[in-house]
Swiss-Prot record:
Family recorded in the similarity comment: Belongs to the peptidase M24B family.
Name of the protein in question: Probable Xaa-Pro aminopeptidase P
Role according to the record: Catalyzes the removal of a penultimate prolyl residue from the N-termini of peptides.
Gene3D superfamilies, per the entry: Creatinase/methionine aminopeptidase superfamily, Creatinase/prolidase N-terminal domain
Residue sites binding Mn(2+) 1 per the record: 427, 525, 539
CDD domains per UniProt: APP
Keyword S-adenosyl-L-methionine attached: no
Annotated source species: Tuber melanosporum (strain Mel28)
GO molecular function, one term: metal ion binding
Reactions the enzyme catalyzes: Release of any N-terminal amino acid, including proline, that is linked to proline, even from a dipeptide or tripeptide
InterPro entries membership: Creatin/AminoP/Spt16_N (IPR029149), Creatinase/aminopeptidase-like (IPR036005), Creatinase_N (IPR000587), Pept_M24 (IPR000994), Pept_M24B (IPR033740), Peptidase_M24_C (IPR032416), Peptidase_M24B_aminopep-P_CS (IPR001131), X-Pro_aminopeptidase_P (IPR050422)
Keyword Manganese part of the UniProt annotation: yes
Cellular component GO terms held in the UniProt record: cytoplasm
Assigned EC number: 3.4.11.9
Length: 619
């Protein structure tokens, strides 16, 4: 991980800030669609700060520059930021949030600026309130992104790749039925229309996929759904005859950038009593519906706070609960993916013990090569985290060719990887050791494993959130005074983004807002990290399902989890003496299931077959 000299970039930005009469400039990580993962052209925060992690916010004044990020990236940010930057370690005691830091810098009547397309309306409203409480003047939406001006001709071009139709045998539901579900929400709210701006929601809604953002099968677009019409805002050059036929005459196609002008016009017509249609919602004066992730710019175009109602997207909520076709596809692709990981780990162990020098990138490339032979493979779902020894302590470590470590067979190796398949998306982490682990490594691994098992075995009543379950995964680490600085679980899309909401398992308060429901796929990934020494993480994907219980208190159904990931744990790192009989039974049962579902992919006496049999032998 190299450090970038940001001195000249900051100097240019500060000159532009003077031109715009902005004292504090905010640079979020997200793009205009509030995407967690972005294309190279939208990596503005990374460009100005040098920090390449997926989460964080940069703030620049005439005298200071600060980067705020969460615990997943403390080590990485410390390595990548140069001397121009102050690192704000989000969540630590006495460390301000980026919003608090902005408000502090705005004291004394200063102006704060931001590109209104890359901050949500809710974030902008909250930030402006903080600024004014501290004596700042206002939050300004700057029309042109100042980072783009600093970047100039070196800024990468925005992708404009073709879109593909996802067959119903993978999606499980015709897209007009999905749109009708949105219209029911409009009817319930007496709303004249809903703007869909999240890229994965649009891809899911129309049963389309793309390649505009690496590892995420999405495409740049917006959608607008009214009680009578559906409009997709997209560059028409992305659509071939098959896609156009798939959408049919019921979907109007408009240029991508015209969304702002057209919804502004619709908003003006509605304001003066000339709605687009004769819909009852328009007559009743209902508000436009926007999701809580809609940009400030879009919200302002619709008329601002008085004209919009911010809701959790009904598309996001329906997408999170997989239908029967999606559930079966996710299970199948995880079995194939598990077989690929077994083949990879068997190969890696054999090569390392023979003395072959393999670096982290070479190993990751080999894993991708093995995966690519699998049925329905469409690419990776994120950059493979292939990390040896102390690099494994960097939670979202990204090895780079020519600047990475050779895998040490005497050290821990952490591999967090996933793939995109037509029938689903995978994300699996395994921590291995090819030599003799230390007592601390074995104890740490076993404590993490115990937490993962506890969450996997949980049974809970309807209405329970991931916030309530998070302690199950941390309890054994906490009992030793240990912990990890990341969430325990995130939602997973079906041939879509590897991270999806609106639910999750973790300590963030927003995880208390959405209950876990049958059909949701979520990761179970506790970990432990010793800076400069080693890192441990174990991750399975699990599916929420209804379970039978001997009683039903409150006449509520009870839920549990079904195991989806099929990859052995590392026997060498398990201290069996720390496991209870119930945990040992769980482990042996899981390994029996892994063997049963994946051994058929290998020749009887192959390297992978022998490795699988050894690693799944009961303890």
């Amino acid at each position: 991980m190299e450090t970038v000299d940001t001195t000249s970039r900051l100097a240019k930005l500060r000159e532009l800030m003077k031109r715009e009469r902005v004292d504090v400039y905010v640079v979020p990580s997200e793009d205009a669609h509030s995407s967690e993962y972005i294309c190279a052209a939208d990596a503005r925060r990374a460009f100005i700060s040098g920090f390449t992690g997926s989460a964080g916010c940069a703030i620049v004044t005439q005298e200071k520059a600060a980067l705020s990020t969460d615990g997943r990236y403390f080590n990485q940010a410390a390595r990548q930021l140069d001397e121009n930057w102050e690192l704000l370690k989000q969540g630590l005691p006495d460390v301000p949030t980026w919003q608090e830091w902005v408000a502090q810098q705005a004291e004394g009547g200063k102006n704060v600026g931001v590109d209104a397309t890359v901050i949500t309306a809710q974030q902008a409203k909250s930030l402006e309130t903080r600024i004014k409480k501290k004596g700042g003047t206002s939050l300004l939406g700057i029309p042109n992104n100042l980072i783009d001006e600093v970047w100039g001709a070196d800024r990468p071009n925005r992708p404009n790749n073709p879109v593909m139709v996802l067959d119903e045998k993978y999606s499980g539901k015709e897209f007009p039925l999905k749109i009708e579900a949105v219209r029911k929400e409009l009817e319930n709210k007496k709303s004249p229309g809903f703007v869909v701006s999240m890229l994965d929601e649009i891809a899911w809604l129309f049963n389309l996929r793309g390649t505009d953002i690496p590892y995420n099968p999405v495409f740049f677009s917006y959608a607008f759904i009214s009680p009578e019409s559906t409009t997709l805002y997209i560059d028409s050059s992305k659509l071939d005859e098959k896609v156009i036929a798939h959408l049919g005459s019921a979907v109007k196609i408009r240029p991508y950038h015209e969304i702002f002008d057209e919804i502004d016009l619709l908003a003006q017509k509605l304001k003066v009593g000339q709605p687009e249609t004769d819909s009852k919602a328009s007559e009743d004066g209902g508000k436009w519906l926007v999701s809580n992730k809609t940009s400030w710019a879009l919200s302002k175009a619709l008329g601002g706070d008085d004209a919009i109602e911010v809701i959790r997207s009904p598309v996001e909520e329906e997408k999170a609960v997989k239908n029967d076709t999606e559930k079966e596809g996710m299970k199948r692709c995880h079995i194939r993916d598990g077989a690929a990981l077994t083949e990879y780990f068997a190969w890696l162990e054999d090569e390392l013990l023979k003395g072959t020098k393999i670096d982290e990138v070479q190993a990751a490339d080999k894993l991708e090569q093995i995966r690519s032979r699998g049925e329905n493979f469409m690419g990776l779902s994120f950059d493979t985290i292939s990390s040896t020894g102390p690099n494994a302590a960097v939670i979202h470590y990204k090895p780079e060719a020519g600047n990475c470590s050779v895998i040490d067979p005497k050290a821990i190796y952490l591999c967090d990887s996933g793939a995109q398949y037509l029938d689903g998306t995978t994300d699996t982490t395994r921590t291995l050791h090819f030599g003799e682990p230390t007592d601390m490594e074995r104890k740490s691994y076993t404590l993490v494993l115990k937490g993962m098992i506890a969450l996997d075995r949980a049974i809970f009543p309807k209405g329970t959130s991931g916030f309530a379950l998070d302690i199950l995964a941390r309890q054994f680490l906490w009992s030793e005074g240990l912990d990890y600085r990341h969430g325990t679980g995130h939602g997973v899309g079906s041939f879509l983004n590897v991270h999806e909401g609106p639910f999750g398992i973790g300590t963030r308060i927003q995880y208390s807002e959405v209950a876990l429901s049958p059909g949701m796929f979520v990761s179970n990934e506790p970990g432990y990290y010793e800076d400069g020494s080693f890192g441990i993480r174990i991750e399975n994907i699990i599916m929420v399902k209804e379970v039978k219980t001997s009683h039903s208190f409150g006449d509520r159904p009870y839920f549990g989890f079904e195991r989806v990931t099929m990859v052995p744990m590392c026997r060498k790192l398990i201290d069996a003496g720390l496991l209870t009989p119930a945990e040992t039974e769980w482990l042996n049962s899981y390994h029996a299931e892994v063997f049963e579902k994946t051994h058929g992919f290998f020749e009887k006496d192959s390297l992978a077959s022998k490795w699988l049999k050894r690693e799944t032998t009961p303890i």
